[in-house]
Amino acid sequence: SGSAAESAVSALARRFGTLMGMTALVIGNGEMGRLTAALLRDAGCSVTVTLRSYRHGETVVPAGCSVVQYGERYSAMDGADVIVSATTSPHYTVTRERFAALERPPRAAVDLAIPRDIEPGVSEFTQLYNIDDLGVSCEIDPATLARARAAIDAHMERLHRWDNYR
């Protein structure tokens, strides 16, 4: 996950020459979002991170970053220089229609999510990068792959037993 966040920040730095003094909105406060927010902060950006109000437990936001509720993300991105979205949402966190309505749309957007967070049509209004553009590989270490396969096999065995029992 570090390589995707680093690639995103590097791509933005190449695009603008520097990120110093720029404003960034990071949508998503999972591991990838927090890492990206911290890297943007370290590059000199003023960073805002979205939070979902229904999540329980302790919320960790990188030091020096401000917070906005997820539902307020469009207000927060209006006037921001860059946005990065890194959620596990099954739907778009940024739609073409809502992005098109912004008075001062961000100059670049980075989508680190699989499946995509940012509707591809957003590219009509700003420079849009996604995981493929950044050349990030999603390699899985053999131990993790073995654990995943074992979990799938166990689940399939339970499913077959249930199906045979019916």
Residue ranges of predicted features:
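Adenosine-phosphate binding glycine-rich loop
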Residues: F99-R166
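Short, well-ordered coil loops that connect the C-terminus of an alpha-helix to the N-terminus
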Residues: T18, A63, S89, R104-P105, ...
